[in-house]
């Protein structure tokens, strides 16, 4: 099966103070009919990420209907775990409650950063507010270095999270051994980690696997994630239980496009279903500097 690219949906114009550059990590939220809100992470003039959104019509290839001027979430207060930026991971709806999981950026001295995971909550359509000034998934003996981009689903009565974790630090940010790990929760805010690595590409030509997106089909869990050798590409894996994964390598149905906004790298896949079709949002060159686009799965 192949993904047919529908084109780039959005790239920042640089006019908004919180979105001078980049549109990374797109995540959809259905509103009504074919209308979706697409959340993403943009960067300000100091390279700090905020979480904003655009409103699109999927019936016409993701045409933009509105670009809200204010972001959903800005960096935290000085000294907090997310004071250097917030990058979206996923959104979960539980009745009238929405939980927005994100990476909180915290720059360090001897290493580039020591990031953790936070959650912001919206009740009955109200604006998102941080659940706490402290991360809900923190660094510890299992994850001593840095965390990234959590993907959360509700599975029965359990919240399940797949997230990125550094195994250490290389000489530069392009040499970070990064794997995907797992945690679960009964309430979405108190998490219990497992003592195992679930996706690891560090033994191949790829040093970093990150930004998992997990979809549950009949009898199988499917994960899309990005992994980086020289440049990011999109990979996939399957599992019967969401814990033991069979890594399938690159998703051969989608790749970079010559002389285009995504000619150098494709990353941060987010797969979702709508009206019997399966779609993928993804970011382009420069970790989303050129924006994000949409593709549809064809048999």
From Swiss-Prot:
Superkingdom of the source species: Bacteria
InterPro entries in UniProt: Glyco_hydro_beta-prop_sf (IPR023296)
Protein name, UniProt field: Uncharacterized protein MT1551
Organism from which the protein derives: Mycobacterium tuberculosis (strain CDC 1551 / Oshkosh)
């Amino acid at each position: 099966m192949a993904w047919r690219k529908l084109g780039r949906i959005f790239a920042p114009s640089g006019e908004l103070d919180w979105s001078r550059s980049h549109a990374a990590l797109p995540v959809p939220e259905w509103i009504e009919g074919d209308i979706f809100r697409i959340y993403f992470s943009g960067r300000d003039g100091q390279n700090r990420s905020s979480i904003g959104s655009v409103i699109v019509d999927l019936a016409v290839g993701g045409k933009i209907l509105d670009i809200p001027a204010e972001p959903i979430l800005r960096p935290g207060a000085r000294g907090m775990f997310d004071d250097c930026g917030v990058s979206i991971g996923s959104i979960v709806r539980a009745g009238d409650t929405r939980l927005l999981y994100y990476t909180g950026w915290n720059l360090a001295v001897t290493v580039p950063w020591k990031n953790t995971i936070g959650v912001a909550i919206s009740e009955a359509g109200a604006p998102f507010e941080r659940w706490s000034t402290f991360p809900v998934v923190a660094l510890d003996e299992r994850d001593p270095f840095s965390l990234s981009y959590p993907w959360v689903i509700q599975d029965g009565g359990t919240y399940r999270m797949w997230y990125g974790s550094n195994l250490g630090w290389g000489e530069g940010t392009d040499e970070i051994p990064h794997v995907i790990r797992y945690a679960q929760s009964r309430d979405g805010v108190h998490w219990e980690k497992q003592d195992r690595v679930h996706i690891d590409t560090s033994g191949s030509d790829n040093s970093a696997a990150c930004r998992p997106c997990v979809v549950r089909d009949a009898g199988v869990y499917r994960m899309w994630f990005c992994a980086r050798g020289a440049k990011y590409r999109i990979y996939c894996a399957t599992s019967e239980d969401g814990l033991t994964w069979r890594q399938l390598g690159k998703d051969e149905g989608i790749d970079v496009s010559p002389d285009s906004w995504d000619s150098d790298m494709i990353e941060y896949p987010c797969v979702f279903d709508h009206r019997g079709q399966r779609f993928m949002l993804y970011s382009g060159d420069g970790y989303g500097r050129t924006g994000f686009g949409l593709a549809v799965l064809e048999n």
